[in-house]
């Protein structure tokens, strides 16, 4: 009762300056811009925004950040999928095979139709590289504003939308890899450049109190930073991105909200930042989040009755108020799987 009274009459109730002078970057959701945001993104959004608000209330200088993965293999598949659907519109579906590993959703067909409506059939005569570059650009120009709109509806306002492509275009990924090489943490094998992740992790775990015997029993593996074809891996870009946060932009700490399926990546990224002298083991904080199961009438719901597609954030917000959704997502620890009861939330 006291808290409710204070919230109504004392706008600054509970605010402290304990975090004064410390700058925290809180990165959350960061969904691939290749399709609509899903239930897992909804949980990460509620958790990340709540955590950022708490840090802000405790006096920290907080930046809410969304990392847009607009480079790499996922975007290549995205462009390839739109391109195939576009060519099917122009040349006939029976004449253009769809790539097996492409994105099969109706949203890809809608993007291809949108591109066709704007540009007509003329792009069929362009080179595949030129055509797919245009498809990626068009698809992102449609999807990213939709993501921003959905997140604003979800009462999340970001301070920074950071494009992965800027790290590659500026040479920052290559520079970061060269720094690791200069510190002796890389080696070449089979034409590729590898990070000695095994040694970095061993040193990290020993510093954290593990014995040599315990460390020797771990199944550790090294990571490719630059493939034999000259392209940098997602891990190399991720190291560069977090170096950008901790070194170039000077945040005291970087806090990331990740799905629990990325747990194997946590120590590796921290260790790589340790190798750069950035104390990643202490300055990079990863909050892992378990899956969400949507229930209706006590049964799992995987598809939207309205659209026939997987449940997206916007579908959820058509059924449930924003405050109810955010409350439910934060009602259990992020380390526990969450059953989201749609009937209860609507009531």
Outline where the language-model segments fall.
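NTP-dependent nucleotidyl-transfer catalytic core
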Residues: 1-347
């Amino acid at each position: 009762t006291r808290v409710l009274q204070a919230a109504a009459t004392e706008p600054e109730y509970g605010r402290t300056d304990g975090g004064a002078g410390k700058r925290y970057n809180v990165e959350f959701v960061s969904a691939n811009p290749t399709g609509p945001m899903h239930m897992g993104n909804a949980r990460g959004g509620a958790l990340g925004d709540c955590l950022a608000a708490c840090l802000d209330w405790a006096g920290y200088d907080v930046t809410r950040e969304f990392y847009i993965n607009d480079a790499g293999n996922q975007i290549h598949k995205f462009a390839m999928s739109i391109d195939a659907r576009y060519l099917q519109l122009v040349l006939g579906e029976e004449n253009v095979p769809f790539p097996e590993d492409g994105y099969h959703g109706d949203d890809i067909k809608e993007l291809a139709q949108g591109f066709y409506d704007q540009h007509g059939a003329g792009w069929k005569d362009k080179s595949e590289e030129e055509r797919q570059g245009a498809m990626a650009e068009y698809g992102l120009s449609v999807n990213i504003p939709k993501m921003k709109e959905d997140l604003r509806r979800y009462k999340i306002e970001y301070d920074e939308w950071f494009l992965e492509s800027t790290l590659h275009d500026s040479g920052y990924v290559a520079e970061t890899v060269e720094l690791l090489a200069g510190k002796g943490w890389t080696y070449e094998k089979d034409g590729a450049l590898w990070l000695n992740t095994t040694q970095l992790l061993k040193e990290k775990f020993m510093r954290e109190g593990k014995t040599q015997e315990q460390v020797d029993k771990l199944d550790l593996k090294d990571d490719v930073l630059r493939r034999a074809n000259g392209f940098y891996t997602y891990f190399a870009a991720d190291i560069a991105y977090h170096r950008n946060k901790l070194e170039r932009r000077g945040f005291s700490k970087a806090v990331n909200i990740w799905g629990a399926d990325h747990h194997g990546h946590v120590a590796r990224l921290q260790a790589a930042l340790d190798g750069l002298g950035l104390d990643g083991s202490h300055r990079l904080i990863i909050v892992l989040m378990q899956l969400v199961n949507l229930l209706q009438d006590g049964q799992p719901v995987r598809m939207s009755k309205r659209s026939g597609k997987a449940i997206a954030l916007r579908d959820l917000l058509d059924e449930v108020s924003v405050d109810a959704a955010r409350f439910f997502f934060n009602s259990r620890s992020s380390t526990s799987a969450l059953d989201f009861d749609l009937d209860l939330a609507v009531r």
